[in-house]
Amino acid sequence: MNDPDSIRRLAGERAKQMGLPYAGAVTPQEAFALMQAGAALVDVRTRAEVYWVGRIPGSAFVEWNSYPEGVRNPAFLEQLAEAVDKDTPIVFLCRSGNRSHFSAMVATQAGWRECYNILEGFEGDRDAREHRSSLNGWKLAGLPWVQG
């Protein structure tokens, strides 16, 4: 499914089912289709993750929390405002979908109109051996990304 309107409807249905306080939740493939239609991808992982694990070309980078301290970025909303207009749809990405969930929630509360969380994140869920990038996620889906 690559039609942005269909993706938005499905994401909204997921939001209702999951009780999400933002526009919706999308798969990595759906997020990529929304990007092609003009949505901004905001990567909220740490600088270390982006450098060592990989990044998505054309994405904006606004850390949700810092590494190694794990402290929430107090300038998150200000940095987000510098990166993305409040009328631009945003798909938020982290490693697994947790930090991006909170980013979408906070951005929605601050007035961004159309925020989505990318389910599975960049690396996806852990497999039986506790490894990521083997079950799902942006990388495994074969979507564009580059190292460092």
Indicate residue ranges for each PLM-predicted region:
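Structural scaffold elements adjacent to functional motifs in cytosolic proteins
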Residues: 41-43
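Short, surface-exposed ligand- or partner-binding patches at beta-edge/loop junctions that are enriched
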Residues: 92-93
